[in-house]
From Swiss-Prot:
Main location: membrane
Taxonomic source organism: Aeromonas hydrophila subsp. hydrophila (strain ATCC 7966 / DSM 30187 / BCRC 13018 / CCUG 14551 / JCM 1027 / KCTC 2358 / NCIMB 9240 / NCTC 8049)
Molecular function, one GO term: heme binding
Ranges of the Periplasmic topological domain: 30-163
Encoding gene (name): ccmE
Cross-referenced Gene3D superfamilies: Nucleic acid-binding proteins
Protein name (record): Cytochrome c-type biogenesis protein CcmE
Length: 163
């Protein structure tokens, strides 16, 4: 092999090795962020066999059932805090500053998108409620595994809705 071909082969192999290393590092860095959906149990315990937990400040989506009696509204603003649960029994607090969807109720499935504040608190910038009484996002349906709570209303709530 003459020196010119040897030099070309060396350059091509070096570029190929560098490109493979860059692609490998990018895929490794993205491996923890490919799946953004978490259930309350996965958020607390970690996801997958490696028990990978999201970092504080990371954007994510979390889905579960709103715990009855956990909704707390700030009377001075639109801030709302509520707890989510799944079949693992872990609770995660979701804080949201905005108008909740009309179909948002305690005991119903929701998906919230936001950032992780601490190990069990998500600051949501979007809250999605389920469509109708039969629809539940597949991710939430798998996570809750039939743990749907039927909403219970007080007499005052029932009378207030008929006005």
């Amino acid at each position: 092999m003459n020196p010119r071909r040897k030099k070309r082969l060396t350059i091509i192999l070096a570029i190929s090795a560098g490109l493979a290393a860059v692609i490998g590092l990018v895929l490794y860095a993205l491996s923890q962020n490919i799946d953004l959906f978490y259930t309350p149990s996965e958020l607390v315990e970690g996801k997958g066999p490696d028990k990978i937990k999201p970092e504080e400040g990371q954007r994510l989506r979390i889905g579960g059932l709103v715990v009855p009696g956990s909704v707390q509204r700030d009377p001075q603003s639109l801030k709302v805090a509520f707890k989510l649960v799944d079949n693992g029994g872990h609770l995660v607090t979701v804080e949201f500053d905005g108008i909740l969807p009309d179909l948002f109720r305690e005991g119903q499935g929701i998906v919230a998108q936001g950032t992780l504040k601490d190990a069990t608190t998500v600051a949501a910038f979007e809250v999605l409620a389920k469509h109708d009484e039969n629809y539940m996002p597949p991710e939430v349906a798998d996570a809750t595994n039939g743990m749907h709570f039927k909403p219970e209303y007080t007499e005052a709530q029932l009378k207030g809705s008929k006005q």
